[in-house]
Amino acid sequence: GLSFLVETEKSRILFDFGAGKAAYDNACKLNIGMENIQYAVGSHGHYDHAGGYPEFVKEGLHCPLYTGTGYFEEKYARDGRKATYLGCGFNEAWMQEQGLEHRICDGYLKLESGCYLVGNFERTHDFEQIPDRFVRRLDDQWIKDDFSDEICMVLDGEEGQTVIVGCSHPGILNILTTVQKRFDKPIRAVFGGTHLVEADAGRIRATLEQMKQMGVGLI
């Protein structure tokens, strides 16, 4: 998992929250007060990116939470008959109890000038497949998780755009291609997880080559 603090000219944005208390402890060491964070963004509903959110809330984070659709769905990893819960550990009802506002990015949402959330990624690269073990529980049935809840953040810059991703379950190239089509601007840098841990050498080479063709110079 991960947790980034992104500072723009206008705001501080907390992008993902880690799995537990560690990300909040890091914020304390950096003397970052929760009252000084204007936006909280959840890339997707897995525990290692979302599980630390309640800790931030307990310590005073009360800005709106921005996520994709389906962030609170029950997510699991299945291995035969064994299913391991991977979800965020809280839900919409808990948000309401805490008096927190939840805002949905349904494909595109502008946070502020030069800062955007993007989701609903086109699946244009066939070799970027989601492992079958990732599933959701819906109406007492197991359904393959397509990670339609995943979103990324895009920042404008003088030399091009910076894309911040959480885990890239839908495929890093699918994400970047969708971003390029929406904005028609060069992508200068990519920060975050690419989920290539299980990829073979051929897929990694193909991914890097296509990212270079897109103009990405910093990963």
Model-assigned labels for residue ranges:
Residues 1-30, 146-164:
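Conserved beta-strand hairpin/beta-sheet module of binuclear metal-dependent hydrolase folds
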Residues 17-20, 45, 69-71, 115, ...:
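Active-site metal-binding loops of divalent metal-dependent hydrolases
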Residues 45-49, 64, 143-152, 156-219:
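Cap/insert and terminal regions of metallo-dependent hydrolase folds
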Residues 10-39, 129, 134-136, 172-173, ...:
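Pre-active-site segment of Zn-dependent metallo-hydrolases
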Residues 81-90, 95, 107-158:
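Active-site-proximal loop/helix segment associated with metal-binding centers of metalloenzymes
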